Amino acid sequence: MSPDTTVDGLRILPTQHSVSQVLQRVESLARARGLTVFAQIDFSGDAERAGLTLRPTGLVIVGNPKAGTPVMAATPTVAIDLPLKVLAWQDAEGKTWVAYNDAEYLRARHGFPAALAKNISALDALAAAAAAQDP
């Protein structure tokens, strides 16, 4: 996978951080930006508890009802993709990646007005900041 790509509506960014570090950074940055952190899912931990093996993989669910509600009011089907999610995983080579749904992809998928895409575009800056190397 090449750095900073969009594949089938997923924005994918490389990071030097571990999966757990990325997820912690997403939570911290989301709260600092006034977003609600609804949940963090540790898929690899869940797999381990089930007696299975999965490379480090996790998801943070974040949102802002003031931003998401107008989008859902305009096009109820977008609720299947909201709240917004940030996925972090480690690949077979040990590289860590961060992915999230591109706002324009969600707009095209659900057909809500283009003016509302900005309401769900917060993940562009949030994911980039979470993936970025500290100065």
Where are these regions (language model features)?
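Terminal, regulation- and interaction-focused segments at domain boundaries
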Residues: 1-33, 132
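Compact, glycine-rich, soluble single-domain proteins
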Residues: 39-87
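Well-ordered alpha/beta subsegment
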Residues: 108-135
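Beta-strand/loop substructures that line and gate deep hydrophobic ligand-binding cavities in soluble
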Residues: 85-113
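Amphipathic alpha-helical hairpins
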Residues: 25, 38, 49-50, 97
